[in-house]
């Protein structure tokens, strides 16, 4: 399960514009927005591109993209 709130927070803190992130992932901005809002899943390659663009550590990447479901 993806921690969308944490991902959006990291994007905002990075100062990188959505269109630039989308381009880095080979997506349209609308497609990236859909993924950020849980309408579509991220592909492994997109997770890699976003992790690099946002300078995520392996721990941060795992906390965002591989968050565990907690009751």
Q: Where on the chain are the PLM-derived regions?
A:
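Short basic helix-loop element that most often maps to the first helix and adjoining turn
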Residues: 4-24
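Key DNA-contact positions within bacterial/archaeal DNA-binding proteins
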Residues: 19, 30, 59
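Short, charged recognition helix plus adjacent turn
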Residues: 9-10, 14-15, 34, 60-71
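Recognition helix of helix-turn-helix/homeodomain-like DNA-binding domains
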Residues: 27-41
């Amino acid at each position: 399960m993806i921690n969308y709130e944490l991902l959006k927070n990291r994007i905002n803190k990075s100062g990188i514009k959505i269109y630039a992130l989308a381009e880095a992932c080979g997506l349209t901005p609308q497609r990236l927005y859909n993924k950020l809002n849980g309408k579509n899943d991220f592909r492994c390659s997109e997770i890699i591109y976003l992790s690099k663009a946002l300078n995520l550590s392996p721990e941060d990447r795992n906390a965002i993209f591989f968050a565990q479901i907690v009751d």
